[in-house]
Amino acid sequence: MSVMDAIDVTKPQAPKTSSGAEKPSLIGLSRQEMAAALREKGVAEKQIKMRVAQLWNWIYVRGVSDFDHMTNVAKDMREMLKQHFTIARPEIVEEQVSNDGTRKWLLRFPARGAGRPVEIEAVYIPEEGRGTLCISSQVGCTLTCSFCHTGTQRLVRNLTAEEILSQLLLARDRLGDFPDREAPQGTIMPAEGRKVSNIVMMGMGEPLYNFDAVKQALLIATDGDGLSLSKRRVTLSTSGVVPEIFRTGEEIGVMLAISLHAVRDDLRDILVPINKKYPLKELIDACKAYPGLSNARRITFEYVMLKDVNDSLEDAKGLIKLLKGVPAKINLIPFNPWPGTNYQCSDWEQIEKFADFINSAGYASPIRTPRGRDILAACGQLKSESERMRKTERLAFEAMMIANHGADD
C-alpha cells in the first residue's frame, strides 16, 4: 500500500529558488536593516525610505521571488539588487500530500558562510474555515522529548529569520495565496479567505532557544503593511523555556502554547526532559504572569495521550489542579506513531473519558484530529531525514498505520 502521494514540484512559473549562491537575502531583515543594506550598496539617502517601502510591498504583499518582477523599480536598481542580494525561496526537495489534504514540504536552505546546506520540514493543515502552517525554528532539536520523532534528530543549528519566514512565503507560493496566483489543481483548502490564515511555531525545534530570530520573523509576519497576519492567529509553542516566556508575550505578543504532557515532575522529567531544569511549578508561575493573559487570550496546553503512561483519570484530576487559576484550553493529542517508538496511543474510549472529565471542570478540551499521519506530518513526527527512511522502516510504519486506523474513525 502507498502511504503518500508525492507531487511534481517542477511546475512552470515556479517561484525562483536558491541556487546555493551566498548572496545575502533581503527576506527577514527589519526595515532598518534593509535600509542599511541599501545604503551600503550606494543607494542615495533620499531614496532609501521609498526603496524600502517598495521592496517590502513586493516581497511581503505581492510575494515576488525575482527582482525582475518589481515593475515599478528602475532597471538599474533591479540590476544592483540582483548583483548583491537574493529574495529566492528555499529548494523544495520533496512535497507530499496526505489523503486528508495535509501537505508536507522538505526544504533545503543553501550554505551560508562556513555552513553547509540544511533541510527542514514545514506542514500545511487545511480546514474548512482556516489553513494552518506549522513552521520549524531549528534544524533538529536539543530537547530529546521521548515521544517525539524530531527529538531523535540532533540539533544542527538555529534557523535564521529569513529561513523561518521563507517557510511562510513558500507555502503561500505553493497554495496560490499571493495576488494573481492560482492554487494547484485538486488542492484541499479553506473555501474562502486566506489559504494560510494561521501559523504555529510547532515544527522542528524549540522556538525559545532561537528567540531573536523567531521574534524578528514573527514581527515581520504580523506587520500590517506586509504579510499582515493577526497576532491572535499566531501561536508559539514551547516545551517550557521559562526565562523566555514573559519576553515572548512582552516583545512578540502572540498566543502561547505549552507542551505539557504530564502533571507530575517525575513523569515530565522523562517525557519532556527540560522539566529537570524548569519544573512544573516554575512553568505554571511563568504562565500565570504571561502578558495579556485573559479568558479571551488563553494559553493552550498540549497533552499527548500515551496509553498507560499519562492517560488515567488521576492524571486528569491532576491536570485540573495544576492549571487552577490559569485561563487555559487543553488540546488532547492522540499519540502519532513513528518507526522505532515504544509508546502507544491511548484507546479512543479512554481519550474521550479524559476529555469529558476535563470539560466538566470547565476547560475546553478538544481532541485534536490526527492530520497527515500517512506522510509523517502529524504532531511529533517531523524529522528532516524522513525522506531517507529505510524500506524496512517504511513497511513497519505502514503496518502501524493499519493497526491504528480504527483510532481515527
Swiss-Prot record:
Residues 127-376 form the Radical SAM core domain. Reaction proceeds by a ping-pong mechanism involving intermediate methylation of a conserved cysteine residue. This is Dual-specificity RNA methyltransferase RlmN. Belongs to the radical SAM superfamily. RlmN family. One of its GO terms (biological process) is rRNA base methylation. Its cofactor is [4Fe-4S] cluster. Residues 1-24 are annotated as: Disordered. Disulfide bonds join 134-379. [4Fe-4S] cluster binds at residues 141, 145, 148. The active site is at residues 121, 379. It catalyses: adenosine(2503) in 23S rRNA + 2 reduced [2Fe-2S]-[ferredoxin] + 2 S-adenosyl-L-methionine = 2-methyladenosine(2503) in 23S rRNA + 5'-deoxyadenosine + L-methionine + 2 oxidized [2Fe-2S]-[ferredoxin] + S-adenosyl-L-homocysteine; adenosine(37) in tRNA + 2 reduced [2Fe-2S]-[ferredoxin] + 2 S-adenosyl-L-methionine = 2-methyladenosine(37) in tRNA + 5'-deoxyadenosine + L-methionine + 2 oxidized [2Fe-2S]-[ferredoxin] + S-adenosyl-L-homocysteine. One of its GO terms (molecular function) is 4 iron, 4 sulfur cluster binding. The keyword 4Fe-4S applies.
